[in-house]
């Protein structure tokens, strides 16, 4: 059994936390996030720490408390530091560019250019024609957008062409021999 919920979250300086029953809102240097916590979780705010514990009468209380603690911890990290995912394009003619109004244009070997509109709160930075960084305060949204962009051309196992995460290792298969 995981014991994530038993460890309290220490709130760093510059982060403001407000509790209202099951609603928690966090303000930091980079923005504001809010979330409703599951009803089986009791939240306490003591000595600049947030403590999660299960309420009586719920069978999944500890599981929900651990999940809630992890979600709130990622919210605190997001508003104070930001999350980022780096994507690399590998393949002949594969290019990426970003317009001023947060639209990503990708040339991925299709007959047309793929355009992707970034939602509010997410920024993209073009390091080179084949590298892009997705940044934002919401960890789930940053990861989902990076996965959506990667899904347009996932790395194939024979030559490794496609869009990959910067830390991803694509295992190359050997070609069929006669």
Curated annotation (Swiss-Prot):
Give the UniProt record's GO annotations in the biological process aspect.
cytoplasmic translation
Q: Where is the signal peptide?
A: none
Which Pfam families does its entry note? Ribosomal_L6 (PF00347)
Matches recorded under InterPro entries: Ribosomal_uL6-like, Ribosomal_uL6-like_a/b-dom_sf, Ribosomal_uL6_a/b-dom, Ribosomal_uL6_bac-type, Ribosomal_uL6_CS
Molecular function via GO: rRNA binding; structural constituent of ribosome
> What Gene3D superfamilies does the annotation carry?
Ribosomal protein L6, alpha-beta domain
Q: Which GO terms describe its cellular component?
A: cytosolic large ribosomal subunit
- Provide the alphabetized UniProt keywords: Ribonucleoprotein, Ribosomal protein, RNA-binding, rRNA-binding
Q: How does it assemble?
A: Part of the 50S ribosomal subunit.
PANTHER family for this protein: 60S/50S RIBOSOMAL PROTEIN L6/L9, LARGE RIBOSOMAL SUBUNIT PROTEIN UL6M
What is this protein's function?
A: This protein binds to the 23S rRNA, and is important in its secondary structure. It is located near the subunit interface in the base of the L7/L12 stalk, and near the tRNA binding site of the peptidyltransferase center.
Q: Which family does it belong to?
A: Belongs to the universal ribosomal protein uL6 family.
* HAMAP family in the cross-refs: Ribosomal_uL6_B
Can you name this protein?
Answer: Large ribosomal subunit protein uL6
Q: Provide the gene name from the record.
A: rplF
């Amino acid at each position: 059994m995981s014991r994530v919920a038993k460890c309290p979250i220490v709130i760093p300086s510059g982060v403001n936390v407000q509790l209202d029953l099951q609603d928690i809102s966090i303000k930091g240097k980079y923005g504001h996030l809010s979330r409703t916590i599951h009803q089986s979780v009791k939240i306490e705010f003591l000595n600049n720490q947030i403590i999660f514990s299960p309420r009586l009468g719920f069978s999944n209380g500890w599981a929900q408390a651990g999940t809630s603690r992890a979600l709130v911890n990622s919210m605190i990290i997001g508003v104070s530091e930001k999350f980022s995912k780096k994507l690399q394009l590998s393949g002949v003619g594969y290019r990426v560019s970003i317009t001023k109004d947060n639209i990503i244009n990708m040339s991925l070997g299709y007959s047309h250019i793929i355009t992707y509109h970034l939602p509010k709160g997410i920024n993209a930075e073009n390091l080179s024609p084949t590298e892009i960084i997705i940044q934002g305060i919401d960890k789930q949204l940053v990861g989902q957008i990076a996965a959506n962009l990667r899904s347009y051309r996932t790395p194939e196992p024979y030559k490794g062409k496609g869009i990959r995460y910067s830390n991803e290792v694509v295992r190359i298969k050997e070609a069929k021999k006669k």
